[in-house]
């Protein structure tokens, strides 16, 4: 990709798609927690002056290639498309964590409380788009429901972050 050979349609003369899938499977098999972006950046540094595209453009193409391959891989394993898309939309930080998150999200979707939770989440996101910086000013909360929601947030914020740091994604989602 760095030298201008970007796979497209049926064109992939160097098997980059197959190689990307192989890398994904190796990471999953061995449980490697190496950030993909670090590997890409190391590769870019090693290529130096041989690059024909800007490093940021190369990173974008490589991440897109891995995202497409990983999406196909997870789809072949039978995970719901929306769960895959949801998790991949957060980025390709850790190949292993992505699969764990897709599993956790897929399990959450099976719960009877998921649909009302998803509706409430969409509403909150819609409201937050109108906000300035994403910070909550407790002095602006007047309605009892607003105050209660903020109390619940304060109560759950740290435990959820701790579960995420421990890679306990299912427990983070259950909170």
Positions of predicted regions on the chain:
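Amphipathic alpha-helical "coupling" segments that flank catalytic cores
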Residues: 1-175
């Amino acid at each position: 990709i760095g030298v201008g050979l970007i796979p497209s349609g049926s064109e992939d003369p160097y098997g980059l798609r197959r190689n990307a899938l192989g890398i994904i499977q190796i990471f999953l098999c061995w449980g490697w927690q190496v950030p993909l972006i670090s590997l890409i950046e190391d590769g870019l540094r090693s290529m130096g002056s041989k690059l024909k595209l800007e490093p940021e453009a190369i990173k974008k193409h490589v991440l897109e290639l891995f995202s497409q391959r990983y999406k196909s891989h997870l789809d072949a394993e039978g995970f719901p498309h929306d769960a895959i898309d949801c998790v991949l939309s957060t980025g390709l930080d850790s190949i292993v964590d992505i699969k764990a998150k897709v599993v956790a999200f897929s399990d959450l979707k099976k719960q009877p409380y998921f649909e009302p939770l998803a509706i409430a989440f969409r509403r909150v996101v819609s409201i937050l788009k109108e906000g300035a910086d994403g910070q909550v000013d407790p002095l602006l909360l007047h309605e009892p429901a607003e105050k209660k929601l903020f109390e619940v947030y304060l109560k759950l914020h740290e435990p959820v972050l701790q579960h995420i740091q421990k890679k306990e994604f299912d427990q983070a989602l259950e909170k």
